[in-house]
């Protein structure tokens, strides 16, 4: 199968996962703030930090380039969404809700960077374990 097809399949899986999770979060917390997008971006950031480190050449898990592209470009590229974050922030600004817009920008940036770092740290710990 072509690499592009693997990435497309991963993207389809990731986008369906994003739609489901962000919808559940929005149902639970409401839509006055883009909680669903924030949650999927933070979760996706943790997973990519973890997976990238775990499957790096010195990592514990041997995954080929196709598998890495399937997960990181396809699944996680479809799961996370910078464009929705941008549009939702713009909509908050257009509605005059500067506080929530600023909170979305700062919160997303800080939480996603912390999440990718925590994912990396978790995989470093797993990579350092002895044995299988």
UniProtKB/Swiss-Prot annotation:
It comes from Opitutus terrae (strain DSM 11246 / JCM 15787 / PB90-1). This is Fluoride-specific ion channel FluC. It is a multi-pass membrane protein. GO terms for biological process: cellular detoxification of fluoride. It is found in: Cell inner membrane. Na(+) binds at residues 77, 80. The lineage of its organism: Bacteria, Pseudomonadati, Verrucomicrobiota, Opitutia, Opitutales. The keyword Cell wall biogenesis/degradation does not apply. It catalyses: fluoride(in) = fluoride(out). Its main location: membrane. The chain crosses the membrane at residues 5-25, 32-52, 70-90, 105-125. GO terms for cellular component: plasma membrane. The gene is fluC. The keyword Nucleotide-binding does not apply. Keywords: Cell inner membrane, Cell membrane, Ion channel, Ion transport, Membrane, Metal-binding, Sodium, Transmembrane, Transmembrane helix, Transport. Na(+) is not transported, but it plays an essential structural role and its presence is essential for fluoride channel function. GO terms for molecular function: fluoride channel activity; metal ion binding. Fluoride-specific ion channel. Important for reducing fluoride concentration in the cell, thus reducing its toxicity. Belongs to the fluoride channel Fluc/FEX (TC 1.A.43) family.
